[in-house]
Amino acid sequence: MKSTVTKIAEKTYQLPVSYKDCMRVPGNVYLDELLFENLQEDVFEQIANVACLPGIQKYSLAMPDCHYGYGFCIGGVAAFDEVTGVISPGGVGFDINCGVRLVKTNLTKNDVTPKLKELLSEIFKNVPSGLGSKGKIRITKDEIDSVLEEGVSWAVEEEYGWERDIKHIEEHGKMKEADPTLVSDNAKKRGLPQLGSLGSGNHFLEVQYVDEIFDEEAAKTFGVSPDQVVLMIHTGSRGLGHQICADYLRYMENAAKKYNIKLPDRQLACAPINSEEGQKYFKAMSCGANYAWANRQLITHWIRESFESVFKTSAEDLEMDIIYDVAHNIAKKEQHLVDGVLKNVVVHRKGATRAFGPGHAEIPSDYVNIGQPVIIPGDMGTASYLMHGTEKAMEQTFGSTAHGAGRALSRVKALKLYTGNEVQEALQKKGILVMADSKGVIAEECPEAYKDIENVADICHDSGISLKVAKMKPMGVVKG
């Protein structure tokens, strides 16, 4: 298949429509030569399969951190016409609104280093983590409906945060289309005890410091400066989101047959966006997204309390404001230019970050001249990046960019090659403290299991789909 792929621009490759009879649009992939050579053939197959779905616009896209996934590849992006297109749970994923939040402080690396172990211990104690972890709060079935409907607004009303937090969250932390009646009792049952917990796998809380500034104006606008300590939170909708996806995958398989949609892969089960089935999934998925935003909000609150406890200063005085919060597993109703015409589309981003350019109405007013903040986390031993969206992303990728480093090794392979103790000791030698619910998670999430984040960030920057603002390096990590 790679023999049919051509390089069409800087760090951009294209899979032609001639590759597969059913392809309606070409597939564009953002890679450099090294990642192109190493990318699995089956990822190209998944990109081609998505290009076969009804109503797809312009391109089937894959970001630099792409790898094999369920239905869409991880790192896959596709926009579908709101009238003729489809919506697919395989284009969102099981962890609905898995996403990343960046919180700033007015502390420096030197302020935090002497108290880092105490701080990590306090965070580890205050934020439940690990497989099957349960949150510290207990909510009723009626209350979970409020969470699913209101998202971050519910958390702020319950005094888990500040009113001003809301403006620096994608969608203001609330998908308005959410309808809790379309979420199964089983999904709610899974979500009830887990609200306010980190979960396991690649989810993490990380204490970082700003190592390098690339764009002084953007950094000043976003409120970051050299040696400043920031917090990164990476988690999603826990078991509730997983159950919503599982419930609707079965539902969508029947819908695809009902509407005579020819699927190149049954994992791409879908329904017309405006059908009863399509609308039900979109509204249930919106509930999962709202749960995830509320989840990150509760965790933010407990991290603020952890800092207050260790530094004997209020979170307000520590200036612990949210820089931004982005979703990277979601489907969104957006407007984009397609062949010079402004169209209503539903953009699927699965392991991809929204990256709206300067001037867009949905960007917070204090950031509108720069572009939307984009947060691209690395792994436990490497840097993370704060970037911003661009007009080029609006033109080429429906305002989308990468979401992280992307896996290079499966969890099973990582466990065979490394032990948790080895990884923990190696990180400690680099001055990075790690706390986790299990040593197995540390091994599974070792730095070697991921692609080079520097490479991914460079491709995004060089191709112009997002631009570097700052580079952060880890000081301490809490893993699920």
Curated annotation (Swiss-Prot):
GO terms for molecular function: GTP binding; metal ion binding; RNA ligase (ATP) activity; RNA ligase (GTP) activity. Mn(2+) 2 binds at residues 98, 234, 328. Mn(2+) 1 binds at residues 95, 98, 203. GMP binds at residues 202-206, 328-329, 377-380, 384, 403-406, 479. Keywords: GTP-binding, Ligase, Manganese, Metal-binding, Nucleotide-binding, tRNA processing. Its EC number is 6.5.1.8. Binds 2 manganese ions per subunit. It holds the Pfam family RtcB. Monomer. This is tRNA-splicing ligase RtcB. It comes from Methanococcus maripaludis (strain DSM 14266 / JCM 13030 / NBRC 101832 / S2 / LL). The gene is rtcB.
